[in-house]
């Protein structure tokens, strides 16, 4: 399953904001950018402010990872499922935007290794209060 709409980052302005202001955390096959939420960039039909000021995520997988959309979508779905479970543990007072970008080397890795790398990036960024 994919992330709910209230947890997704959408729009090129939001991605530009993340690329310009986000803190960068690297691993061998993944990149994490973390920035404080900017509610002015969200166009939401949901009038409830708890959705506007919540933690949001995006996963970016370029054509360099795989030319086949099926493969990219499988990776994206796997990472979305994992993130959905992890986001339940984020404190509600943290309004963060997370952008995970996969590198071409990620295609050769085992899915368990990718999830482990995602965990290490999240712990480097100190997102959770575990």
Curated annotation (Swiss-Prot):
One of its GO terms (cellular component) is ribonuclease P complex. Pfam families: Ribonuclease_P. GO terms for biological process: tRNA 5'-leader removal. One of its GO terms (molecular function) is 3'-tRNA processing endoribonuclease activity. PANTHER family: RIBONUCLEASE P PROTEIN COMPONENT (PTHR33992:SF1). Signal peptide: none annotated. The keyword Nucleotidyltransferase does not apply. InterPro entries: Ribosomal_Su5_D2-typ_SF, Ribsml_uS5_D2-typ_fold_subgr, RNase_P. SUPFAM superfamilies: Ribosomal protein S5 domain 2-like. It comes from the Bacteria. RNaseP catalyzes the removal of the 5'-leader sequence from pre-tRNA to produce the mature 5'-terminus. It can also cleave other RNA substrates such as 4.5S RNA. The protein component plays an auxiliary but essential role in vivo by binding to the 5'-leader sequence and broadening the substrate specificity of the ribozyme. Its EC number is 3.1.26.5. It catalyses: Endonucleolytic cleavage of RNA, removing 5'-extranucleotides from tRNA precursor. Belongs to the RnpA family. This is Ribonuclease P protein component. The keyword RNA-binding applies. Keywords: Endonuclease, Hydrolase, Nuclease, RNA-binding, tRNA processing. Consists of a catalytic RNA component (M1 or rnpB) and a protein subunit.
């Amino acid at each position: 399953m994919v992330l709910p709409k209230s947890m997704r980052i959408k729009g090129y302005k939001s991605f530009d904001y993340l690329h310009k202001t986000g803190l960068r955390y690297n691993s061998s096959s993944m990149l994490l950018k973390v920035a404080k939420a900017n509610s002015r960039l969200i166009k939401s039909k949901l009038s409830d402010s708890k959705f506007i000021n919540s933690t949001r995520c995006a996963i970016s997988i370029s054509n360099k990872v795989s030319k086949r959309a099926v493969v990219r979508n499988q990776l994206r779905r796997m990472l979305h499922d994992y993130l959905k479970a992890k986001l339940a543990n984020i404190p509600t007072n943290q309004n963060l935007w997370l952008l995970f970008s996969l590198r071409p080397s990620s295609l050769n890795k085992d899915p368990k290794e990718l999830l482990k790398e995602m965990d290490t990036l999240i712990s480097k960024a100190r997102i959770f209060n575990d």
